[in-house]
Amino acid sequence: METKWFDLRTAEDAERIAQAADILRRGGLLAIPTETVYGLGANGLDENAVLHIFEAKGRPQDNPLILHIPDASWLTRYCEDVPEAAYKLAERFWPGPLTMILKKKPCVPLRTTGGLETVGMRCPDHAVTRAIIEKAGVPVAAPSANTSGRPSCTTAEHVREDMWGKIDGIVDGGPCQVGVESTIIDLTVTPPQLLRPGGLPLESLIDALGEVTVDKAVTQKMNDGEKPRAPGMKYRHYAPKAPVTVVTGGAKASARYLLTHAGENAGIICFDEFVPLFEGHIVHPLGASDDKRAQAQHVFDALRTFDETDVGEIWAQCPDSKGLGLAIGNRLKKAAGFHTEASDDGKTVVGITGCTGAGKTSLLHALEREGACILDCDKIYHEMLESDESLRKALRAAFGGTIFRADGTVDVHALGLIVFQDAEKLASLDAIVCAHVPRECARRMAESNAKLIGLDAIKLIECGLGAICDVTIAVTAPEEVRVRRIMARDGITEEYARARIAAQQAAEYFRAQCGCEFVNDLPTAAEAAAAAEDFIHMIIKNLKEETER
């Protein structure tokens, strides 16, 4: 079959719109853009055209289709007993990502509705598609324009991958702005019931209607033999080729969980701020943990991207269920066949960093007195040099065998001579360390019985470890104070102490990167200890209050 391509990204073209509409009138299949995902459209009143949708997608025929219309005035053409609530929702949210389940009229074939006496109605928020429907003069039945079992399409190129040569035309209307399918609400029951979370948050429906219940299929698999009342309820859509595990819980806790559970050949879907932690993996960022609109736009692209790789498994962070998070989580969990793992461990992680000589020890001791498990990343790195074969292999590949002694141990001095005279090699060492140490830190956090963890790392920010801390503290002190401390601590000259300070990031860097600052310029150890204890008490109190809010 020849597939026609209609480029309507930049302007409405009356001639091309008419040509696209003619495909629908003649009973053909046309991929259309919407604000949510691309749809595979056909005349919803033509049983043969609808059958071709199921054939092109490989879609089960008991999976209902949604009718797309240009405005609410078309509702009474295809629906019986339209309730006032439907017009109320249409006025407030149409055009937009909302589908309403209503009683169908006899003119709507049972093939379109999956054998149900109800039909889903939607007005898409895409001017080109509404113009095509208006010109065609028929309601357009349109599930997502992907092969069944594949992630939904959010660009016309995605549609081309799945449907070229199988359908009559593809309308390129640009990338979808929402990225997840429409929200579906059943208005034939009292109170109204959410059947599928989508681009319109549940909270918006509750605000408009009052009470809205949530069907159990939103959060768990339907039982065998149950008939789906709306698209996306029963069947495992959005499934990439590799098995998916979705990790629920707080963003930081779930990132720590991924670090300790994802295998070497795992693909990672994570929030933007955690990407540096997964060096060496194929990573698809979902969006920042606090930006659910971006997450919705990226979720299907993330799932689809991994099909072009050889990853053996996919691990995905899951947003909370507020706002669009309910829909994003629903799509991820469906991709995983509802295979989820919970990450919340009740642990609080305090990251401490700062310049040499700033006095981090005072804060670390204060944390210890609160029962914290202290993880010294530098110490962990040196322990890994002795025992971690993956790290040793990476070092050998980067720096050769000359950094190893005859007994096979790493000669740290020899390694230092190489990297401290060559900025590129130092950067290479930093990258290797950052690819290995965070995973070991996360493993030790998970193994510890302590609920409070102190993470001591000079490279806390660069390695991405700061992102998995509940709070990050920059410890600073005036340069003259640091010089005196380093000289006394290490027995070195003032010149050497100043050279060490000059080789590190300035205090301003740590101050800008961390959530708070502890200025340790006190003259005695006792005064520093008392101030550190007060500071840690304040930090723990603030974290507790944030958790309770």
Give residue spans per PLM region.
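NTP-dependent small-molecule kinase module
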Residues: A18, R443-L452, G466-V475, E479-I492, ...
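P-loop (Walker A) phosphate-binding loop of NTP-binding proteins
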Residues: C355, L367
